[in-house]
Curated annotation (Swiss-Prot):
Sequence positions bearing N6-lipoyllysine: 58
Cofactor: (R)-lipoate
Name of this protein: Glycine cleavage system H protein
Keywords associated with the record: Lipoyl
Gene giving rise to this polypeptide: gcvH
PANTHER family attached to this UniProt entry: GLYCINE CLEAVAGE SYSTEM H PROTEIN, GLYCINE CLEAVAGE SYSTEM H PROTEIN-RELATED
Similarity remark: Belongs to the GcvH family.
Alphabetical list of SUPFAM superfamilies matching this protein: Single hybrid motif
One Pfam family in the UniProt entry: GCV_H
Length: 120
């Protein structure tokens, strides 16, 4: 199940685990990424918490945790090569996997058409 946030994160939910990243729109707005800081595996976050940081040639920005949960995996490849987030934001450029506290909370997020409407 693919969901989006108003803060430009995407989630691909399989069972009770969500793979999280930033959208192509967000990556495009930021420009070429030069640095990514990811959370620690095992860290717990609440919806809206700062979970990761990205820095581009234009700006630094936070990546927010889209739902309550615990980090189960991080994508080390994007810390070594932040450009993966620009070139494949919804594929190889994912940030972390989150074991969701309550999968039903995802119902409050945007679907793809709702997100497209948000970004115009």
């Amino acid at each position: 199940m693919l969901k989006f946030t108003e803060e430009h994160e995407w989630l691909n939910i399989e069972g009770d685990v969500a793979t999280v990243g930033i959208t192509a729109h967000a990556a495009g707005q930021l420009g070429d990424l030069v640095f990514v800081e990811l959370p620690e595996v095992g860290a717990s976050f609440s919806k809206g918490d700062d979970a990761a940081t990205v820095e581009s040639v234009k700006a630094a920005s936070e990546v927010y945790c889209p739902l309550d949960g615990e980090i189960t995996e991080i994508n080390e490849a994007i810390t070594a090569d932040p450009e993966l987030v620009n070139s494949d934001p919804m594929g190889a450029g994912w940030f972390f996997k989150l074991k969701l506290k309550n999968v039903a909370d995802a119902d409050g997020l945007l679907d793809e058409s709702g997100y497209k409407e948000l970004i115009g």
